[in-house]
Amino acid sequence: MNPILTNRLQKKLGYTFQQHDLLLQALTHRSASSKHNERLEFLGDSILSYVIANALYQRFPRVDEGDMSRMRATLVRGNTLAEMAREFELGECLRLGPGELKSGGFRRESILADTVEALIGGVFLDSDIRTVEKLILDWYRSRLDEISPGDKQKDPKTRLQEYLQGRHLPLPTYQVVQVRGEAHDQEFTIHCQVSGLAQPVVGNGSSRRKAEQAAAEQALKLLELE
């Protein structure tokens, strides 16, 4: 691993690892090594959920559980994490196997998002819960400042369905058109047919549900609702 890249990444993250092997493991996809980042990802996912839930609870004392759940889902969903990964220029530091490199895995949203969670898990093991909580809140400062309760936090499929129902239009249809990769690391491609759009909208994700949500989000953008 190029030390120039990892040093630059740590500056962007705002954290320097004491145990460098944890950083390397967090950046390692299962296609590259048996010592990959999935256990760190599991840990980081839980820590991220706790930190964001606690931040929302403190910021919005009058907001009900449903709205807080929707806001948390918006903040921790895959495309938000992938967007953050691109801000960190994380793709250049990923350790991928030859197949993933060839297929552009360093750009794949699911891999980028999973790696952010793995880094959170790695930082926790390298330090403590207070340190990783402060770091996550630093990463999320602008997003937490911008987010607010309300319909905007409903997931894209729900918002698309409500939009169409409100206009007495047929509900969207979702069709799996491609599944790539092995069982542990698949990428689904979905076509979403929406009344009012001439062509099916395409969505990709690491599960059918995520791909459908991605397609619905694209449809909302085309309908100028996003």
Swiss-Prot record:
It is found in: Cytoplasm. Its main location: cytoplasm. Gene3D superfamilies: 3.30.160.20, Ribonuclease III domain. It comes from the Bacteria. Its EC number is 3.1.26.3. GO terms for biological process: mRNA processing; regulation of gene expression; rRNA processing; tRNA processing. Its cofactor is Mg(2+). GO terms for molecular function: double-stranded RNA binding; metal ion binding; ribonuclease III activity; rRNA binding. It holds the Pfam family Ribonucleas_3_3. Residues 6-128 form the RNase III domain. InterPro entries: dsRBD_dom, RNase_III, RNase_III_dom, RNase_III_sf. Residues 155-225 form the DRBM domain. Mg(2+) binds at residues 41, 114, 117. One of its GO terms (cellular component) is cytoplasm. Homodimer. Belongs to the ribonuclease III family. PANTHER family: RIBONUCLEASE 3, RIBONUCLEASE III. NCBIfam families: RNaseIII. Digests double-stranded RNA. Involved in the processing of primary rRNA transcript to yield the immediate precursors to the large and small rRNAs (23S and 16S). Processes some mRNAs, and tRNAs when they are encoded in the rRNA operon. Processes pre-crRNA and tracrRNA of type II CRISPR loci if present in the organism. This is Ribonuclease 3. The lineage of its organism: Bacteria, Pseudomonadati, Pseudomonadota, Gammaproteobacteria, Enterobacterales. The gene is rnc.
